[in-house]
Amino acid sequence: METATLVAISISGLLVSFTGYALYTAFGQPSQKLRDPFEEHGD
């Protein structure tokens, strides 16, 4: 394959992986450990 094709596929794969990890962190199992500063601030 050409170098440009490999670079494009690699960057696309990294972007998809990062997006998947971010969604898992935000909505998956680790989201239980995230703190909510608005909920902590009692008015």
From Swiss-Prot:
Major location (coarse): plastid
Keyword check for Transferase: no
Membrane topology label: Single-pass membrane protein
Keywords: Chloroplast, Membrane, Plastid, Thylakoid, Transmembrane, Transmembrane helix
InterPro entries associated with the record: PSII_PsbN
GO CC annotation, single: chloroplast thylakoid membrane
Any one GO BP annotation for this protein: photosynthesis
Localization, UniProt: Plastid, Chloroplast thylakoid membrane
Pfam families: PsbN
Transmembrane segments: 5-27
Family: Belongs to the PsbN family.
Function: May play a role in photosystem I and II biogenesis.
Protein name as it appears in the record: Protein PsbN
Species of the source: Phalaenopsis aphrodite subsp. formosana (Moth orchid)
